[in-house]
Swiss-Prot record:
GO molecular function, one term: protein domain specific binding
Swiss-Prot/TrEMBL domain comment: The E7 terminal domain is an intrinsically disordered domain, whose flexibility and conformational transitions confer target adaptability to the oncoprotein. It allows adaptation to a variety of protein targets and exposes the PEST degradation sequence that regulates its turnover in the cell.
Keyword tRNA-binding: no
Regions that span the bilayer: none
Posttranslational modification: Highly phosphorylated.
Alphabetical list of InterPro entries matching this protein: Papilloma_E7
Motif Nuclear export signal per record, residues: 68-76
Protein's job: Plays a role in viral genome replication by driving entry of quiescent cells into the cell cycle. Stimulation of progression from G1 to S phase allows the virus to efficiently use the cellular DNA replicating machinery to achieve viral genome replication. E7 protein has both transforming and trans-activating activities. Induces the disassembly of the E2F1 transcription factor from RB1, with subsequent transcriptional activation of E2F1-regulated S-phase genes. Interferes with host histone deacetylation mediated by HDAC1 and HDAC2, leading to transcription activation.
GO cellular component: host cell cytoplasm; host cell nucleus
Protein name: Protein E7
Subunit structure: Homodimer. Homooligomer. Interacts with host RB1; this interaction induces dissociation of RB1-E2F1 complex thereby disrupting RB1 activity. Interacts with host EP300; this interaction represses EP300 transcriptional activity. Interacts with protein E2; this interaction inhibits E7 oncogenic activity. Interacts with host TMEM173/STING; this interaction impairs the ability of TMEM173/STING to sense cytosolic DNA and promote the production of type I interferon (IFN-alpha and IFN-beta).
Amino acid sequence: MHGPHPTVKDIELSLAPEDVPVQCNVQLDEEDYTNVEEPAQQAYRVVTLCPKCSSPLRLVVECSHADIRALEQLLLGTLTVVCPRCV
């Protein structure tokens, strides 16, 4: 509509929304969601002393670099590993 007053010829009554194809059952390829990259696992040997009898303890864990850092923080904090004889 142009001008100060609308006229009948400016009004369209046959407006309809465009047809848009909608696919509701779209499935992803298996590789799209199974290729989540896991952090690299590596074996780490932890050697410490039993806090009760001072005997050496050896612990082998397999984890990511971030997880071994978390274990290190736990061992430096309040977590203690004791030998089976001292339990």
